[in-house]
Amino acid sequence: MTPAQKSGRRIAVIVAHPDDEVLGCGGTIRRHILAGDEVWVVILADGETSREGTSGDKAVVERETAAQAAANILGVQHLAVHRFADNRLDAEPLLHIIRVVEQHIREISPDTVYTHHAGDLNIDHRRTHEAILTACRPQLSHPVTRMLAFETPSSTEWQQPSGVLSFSPNWFVDISSTP
């Protein structure tokens, strides 16, 4: 099936930062695109980091530009970037984040949502997961039938194992032949 032949599946990838979508499930996004699925990527935080030399408005614009370039390479036609403060989603009222996510869920009407694992070390990743879990809770006429959490390399594996929140994947997507 080519991208021109739509499969009817609608996929939302909702992440905290620019690049999380690629690190977490870039190959899976590409596979969905090639299967004819419509994929939306929603980025919540502005991408400014606390690392020296990587902050400020210029860095934010560069991260957004890089996110758009990555979306173009993957074939993603729908990209939304919000400007919640990076590494400070825990300072934002959770309800504000949930409302943004719920608005996207209403607009996209996805059957599947991909996001961060709840036990990730990064607070923004955990907060994003929490907001999505709330926004995608089962309700009558709710479109989301599957929510999948991914590992974010360089973040998830640094978390100390804590039983139920340890990342233990049970869903795998074979991307070995995905161009």
Predicted feature descriptions by range:
Residues 1-14, 31, 35, 54, ...:
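Metal-dependent de-N-acetylase/amidase catalytic core
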Residues 25, 64-67, 128-129:
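A general structural signal for well-ordered alpha-helical segments in protein cores
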Residues 42-43, 83, 148-151:
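Short beta-strand segments
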Residues 47-79:
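Glycine-rich phosphate-binding loop and adjoining beta1-alpha1-beta2 segment
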